[in-house]
Amino acid sequence: MRLPPVLLLLFVLSACALFGGGRKYVVFFQERSAQLDRQAQSVISGAAARANTNPASSVKVIGYTDSAGSPAADVARSQQRAQTVADALVADGVAANRLVREGRGQTRENSGVASRRVEIIIDP
């Protein structure tokens, strides 16, 4: 079975994030969406498991968007995505007081699906 290029890109980017020492996890979103799909849930569950093995670590949840909307709308969407991921982390057992949420809006270094993301960074 041949994977569509977008799905292949998501898989490769997710794998890179997960195998980079296990401290940074990346959740991707569809355009103009803050809903979590199954793959996003899986990444979040992995991040939560990692965070729960080190309860003294802080967990940063940083949302980004592509440039599909206005800068103000994109900041709001990135904040909404970060909150959605933070809520899922809490549902998976991560204490809410360990989470730092931030929405940064549009990214400059990437476009498309790579920009529509939330990064979960677990600091020891």
How would you name each of these model-derived features?
Residues 29-37, 71-75:
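Second-shell loop/turn segments in exported
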Residues 10-32:
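Bacterial Sec signal peptide processing site at the extreme N-terminus
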Residues 65-124:
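Periplasmic OmpA-like peptidoglycan-binding domain that tethers envelope proteins to the cell wall
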Residues 2-9:
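Sec-dependent signal peptide recognition
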Residues 32-62, 86, 123:
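Periplasmic peptidoglycan-binding/anchoring modules of Gram-negative envelope and division proteins
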Residues 1-2, 17:
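N-terminal hydrophobic targeting signals that begin at the initiator methionine
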